[in-house]
Amino acid sequence: MISLRSISRSPAVQPARIYRTLATADTSGINEQAKPKTKRKKTVFSDSLNKGPSFEDFVNGKAADMLVDPLEAARQDPNQRLPKWLKVPIPKGKSFNNLKNDVRELKLATVCEEAKCPNIGECWGGKKSEATATIMLMGDTCTRGCRFCSVKTSRAPAKPDPMEPENTAEAISRWGLGYVVLTTVDRDDLVDGGANHLAETVRKIKEKAPQILVEVLGGDFRGDLDMAAILARSGLDVYAHNIETVEALTPYVRDRRATYRQSLSILNKAKETKPSLVTKTSLMLGFGETDEQIMQTLKDLREIKCDVVTFGQYMRPTKRHMKVVDYVKPEKFDYWRDTALQMGFLYVASGPLVRSSYKAGEAFIENVIRKRRHNVGETPRLAQEVNPKIISQSI
C-alpha cells in the first residue's frame, strides 16, 4: 500500500532532478563552444627531450650518435664563433696575482673584473711602471641599466664607504703604479652623484703619491655641470667621460637618463673649468652605427676640444644584453684611428679589444700630461704615425 507521504513527495523530487540534469547538460554545451582552443606552449627543454633519444635508443647503444654537443656545434657554426682577433690568453703572472690579492685584501672593486674586461691580463700583468688598474669607487652596483653593461644594478645601492678614499690611496701607493684610473658606477641616489667622494679620493692619492698620474672616468651627474667642475678641480690629470655610441643609437644603447648632448656638456665643462686637463671619451662599435654617424661624433668631440678618444668592439656580456650587430674588422679600427688623429685628437687607441682605460698610462699620453702640467713647450701629437693614405685623402 502506498502511503500518502510518499505520493506527496514524488512529484516535487522528480521534476527537480530532471531540471538539474537538463540545466547541467545545456550549460556544459555552451561552455564547450565558448572555450577558445589554446595551443601547447613550446619549451626548449621539453622539445629537446621529445626530439632526443628514447629509452630504447639508450638500451641499444644508439644514443651517443643522436646527441649533439653544444660546444662542438658552436665550433662547426662560424656564426656562433667569435672572430679570432677577439680571443685573448688567460690572465696570469706575478704582477697580476699581486694586484688581485691587494684588491681583495682592501675590499676594492675594479671595473676590470666587474665589467669582464678582456684586457685584464695585459693591464694587470705589466711591469709596475706600465701596469694600469682601474678602481671602481662607490660600490659595484649602479643605479642605471645600460643595455651593453654587465655591472649590477639597483635603485638603492649601499651607501659609499667613507674609508674608501683612504683605502684606495693606500693601495695605489703600495702598488707603485705610474698611472691609475678611477671609475665609478652611476649614483643617481646621491645628491651630488658622488662628485665629492671622487674628488676626495683624488686628493688622498695625490697626498700619498704625488708622482702618480690620475685619470677619473666619471658619470654625467644627471647633467649637473657644477658637479663636473668640482671633479675637474680635484687635482686629477685626465677627465674621462664615455659617450659610448653615436647620437642616433644613444636612446637604444644607454639608460634613458643618459643623453648624447648631456655627455658632451660634461666634457665641455671639464675643459672650460681647467683648460690644461686632458679630456677623454670612448666609443664602442658594433651596434649598427654608420660611418657618417661616427664621423659626426668625432666632429662634435673636436668642437668641445676633446683630446683623447678610444674605439673598441662591443661584446655582448650575457643573453640579457643587446645583440652584436656586426664584428668590426681590425682594418676598420685602424682607419678610425688614423682618421681621428688627422682630425686633431692628441691620442687615439683603436682596436677590437680596446676599452676606455686600455693602456691609459702609455708613455705618450704621460708625456702630454706632464708637459701640460708644467706648461713646457708645445703639446706633442701622434701625427707622425698617421697613415699617409688618410692624410692624402683629406688634402
From Swiss-Prot:
GO CC list: mitochondrion
Organism classification: Eukaryota, Fungi, Dikarya, Ascomycota, Saccharomycotina
Species name: Debaryomyces hansenii (strain ATCC 36239 / CBS 767 / BCRC 21394 / JCM 1990 / NBRC 0083 / IGC 2968)
Catalytic activity: [[Fe-S] cluster scaffold protein carrying a second [4Fe-4S](2+) cluster] + N(6)-octanoyl-L-lysyl-[protein] + 2 oxidized [2Fe-2S]-[ferredoxin] + 2 S-adenosyl-L-methionine + 4 H(+) = [[Fe-S] cluster scaffold protein] + N(6)-[(R)-dihydrolipoyl]-L-lysyl-[protein] + 4 Fe(3+) + 2 hydrogen sulfide + 2 5'-deoxyadenosine + 2 L-methionine + 2 reduced [2Fe-2S]-[ferredoxin]
GO molecular function terms attached to this record: 4 iron, 4 sulfur cluster binding; lipoate synthase activity; metal ion binding
Record protein name field: Lipoyl synthase, mitochondrial
Residues binding [4Fe-4S] cluster 2, per UniProt: 142, 146, 149
Residue span, Radical SAM core domain: 127-346
Keyword annotations of the record: 4Fe-4S, Iron, Iron-sulfur, Metal-binding, Mitochondrion, S-adenosyl-L-methionine, Transferase, Transit peptide
Transit peptide: 1-14
Database matches in SUPFAM superfamilies: Radical SAM enzymes (SSF102114)
Ligand binding ([4Fe-4S] cluster 1): 112, 117, 123, 357
Cofactor note: Binds 2 [4Fe-4S] clusters per subunit. One cluster is coordinated with 3 cysteines and an exchangeable S-adenosyl-L-methionine.
Pfam families hit by this protein: LIAS_N, Radical_SAM
Cofactor: [4Fe-4S] cluster
EC number(s) recorded for this UniProt protein: 2.8.1.8
InterPro entries found in the cross-reference section: Aldolase_TIM, Elp3/MiaA/NifB-like_rSAM, LIAS_N, Lipoyl_synth, rSAM
Pathway: Protein modification; protein lipoylation via endogenous pathway; protein N(6)-(lipoyl)lysine from octanoyl-[acyl-carrier-protein]: step 2/2
Subcellular location: Mitochondrion
Family according to the record: Belongs to the radical SAM superfamily. Lipoyl synthase family.
